[in-house]
A protein has these predicted regions:
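Catalytic cores of the polymerase beta-like nucleotidyltransferase superfamily
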Residues: 1-490
């Protein structure tokens, strides 16, 4: 059957994308064929070439065993190494390209742990049959460049759909992590999961519990960093996967009362995420622009309101409140991210942004004082560029006048921050006298009283800005005269 126009377009794009590496691939392919083996480019690099994307990896599969692959690569590449001989994988570098060659696999899966029982195969088609999705079960034989697509993965790419090579229940039963990969590919590649895939994910979501938290986290991170995380998250939530990984997310689907006294928090959170992504800077931009994709900003946008279900209260005036939801949410964020095995720095940054996301609104609608600006910047610290974007994103009101007012106030705040930063080092605000100088002025030794004195001068610095060392010393003496301990110092 003749290829459709979309398929032909994809084929042309693949040839164009692979052109820079085709000489290298055909050279390596000839080495393997001359030694009596089959070899093919497989999986992600083939898929990405059809999508017009440059894949950083060159993954190949071969009939050669790992010892044979290692011998061929050692004689051809600039360097070679053992990636995972037990899994049949040998790595190599040729020029600027990194290559991984893996022996055909015909794994079975342990019925309890679902971990693969590694077995090497003897033909390409069997290897492709065990792959997770049809779009990843495409290959290009080398050096002939024959395209092999037994499960119509190319047609799936043209239709932007995601299917498994065989029955999805069998595929997900073999490795439940593939359900997370489905949500990730929806986010990364803008695909739609086929109905049988969605059904199987829904029926088998609970089996994800046997997969390690680290593996699940890695797929979730890739989902969040994709080009369409909202779509991936929707699949993640609707199939029930989220209930086993991030239950706080579906919990945001608060049941609205008959008066609809608050917005849909789940929908609001997804909109905030999309708006935060729109404010990310280019990948090669300065840190102040928050180069995208930025995991910390995206996680904070998604989770900023997770404290609302626990703090929702219906008031007597038919209103609804979520008092202190930012504080509750920060603790919930840290707890969940630790359970998902996120690193400490990322966990701390995301939970701090959740805690600070209402700070802008705490200053009211009036003009910001210099003191308020200093405290805002100091509280945010190095997270300020992200907090700026999170705060701007957290405006999903349909009231155009209100949205314009908030935008104007925030524009003014950013101007104020820029002006003060030109005059002062706002990202490292400290008193104009250090601890030793405070002790000398007051005639006291290090201890709790000195700490209180330091905090007082820091408050003076916040409220009044740079007033000079003499004025700071005078303010310190005035404060000291009111302290009970001053009577005991001679």
């Amino acid at each position: 059957m003749a290829a459709s126009d979309p398929t032909n377009a994809l084929l042309r794009e693949a040839v164009r994308r692979l052109a820079p590496v085709l000489p290298l691939l055909t050279e390596l392919g000839s080495r393997f064929v001359d030694a009596g083996h089959e070899i093919a480019l497989v999986g992600g690099p083939v898929r990405d070439a059809f999508l017009g994307r440059v894949s950083p990896d060159l993954d190949l599969t071969t009939s050669a065993g790992p010892d044979q692959s290692e011998a061929i690569l050692a004689a051809w590449a600039d360097a070679s190494w053992d990636v995972g001989r037990a899994f049949g994988t040998i790595g190599a570098r040729k020029g600027d390209h990194v290559i991984e060659v893996t022996t055909y696999r015909a794994d079975a899966y342990d019925r309890v742990s679902r971990k693969p029982v590694v077995a090497f195969g003897d033909n390409l088609l069997d290897d492709l049959a065990r792959r997770d999705f049809a779009i990843n079960a495409m290959a290009m034989r080398l050096p002939s460049l024959e395209f092999v697509d037994p499960y119509d993965g190319l047609a799936d790419l043209a239709l932007r759909t995601l299917r498994t090579p065989g029955a999805p229940e069998v595929s997900f039963g073999d490795d439940p992590l593939r359900m997370m990969r489905a949500a990730r590919f929806v986010s990364q590649l803008g695909l739609t999961a086929a109905p049988p895939v969605v059904t199987a994910m829904t029926d088998m979501a609970s089996s994800l519990a046997i997969v390690s938290a680290e593996r699940v986290r890695d797929e979730f991170v890739k989902l969040m960093l994709g080009s369409a995380p909202r779509q991936g998250l929707a699949l993640f939530v609707e199939t029930g996967l989220a209930a086993h990984v991030l239950p706080e997310l579906p919990a945001l689907k608060l049941e609205l009362d008959e008066h609809h006294r608050h917005k849909d928090v789940y929908e609001h959170s997804l909109i905030v995420l999309e708006q935060a992504i729109a404010l990310e800077g280019p990948p090669d931009g300065p840190a102040s622009s928050v180069p995208g994709p930025d995991l910390v900003l995206r996680l904070a946008a998604l989770l900023h309101d997770i404290g609302k279900p626990a703090t929702r209260r219906f008031e007597d005036d038919n209103g609804v409140s979520f008092h202190h939801h930012e504080m509750v949410g920060a603790k919930m964020t840290a707890r969940r991210m630790r359970a998902m095995r996120f690193d400490k720095d990322t966990t701390k940054a995301v939970s701090r942004l959740v805690e600070l996301h209402l700070r802008f609104h705490g200053y009211g609608d009036g003009e910001w004082t210099d003191s308020a600006v200093r405290r805002y910047v100091t509280d945010a610290g190095p997270l300020l560029p992200r907090l700026n974007r999170l705060t701007r994103s957290d405006c999903t009101t349909r009231n155009v006048r209100k949205a314009r007012t908030l935008s104007r106030i925030y524009d003014d705040l950013e101007l104020r921050i820029a002006r003060l930063m030109a005059q002062e080092q706002l990202d490292a605000v400290r008193p104009e006298l250090d601890g030793n100088e405070i002790a000398e002025v007051l005639g006291i030794a290090p201890g709790p009283v000195l700490g209180r004195a330091y905090k007082h001068l820091l408050a003076v610095r916040m409220d009044q800005g740079l007033i000079g060392r003499e004025a700071a010393a005078e303010a310190l003496r005035g404060w000291w005269a009111e302290q009970p301990e001053s009577d005991t110092v001679t």
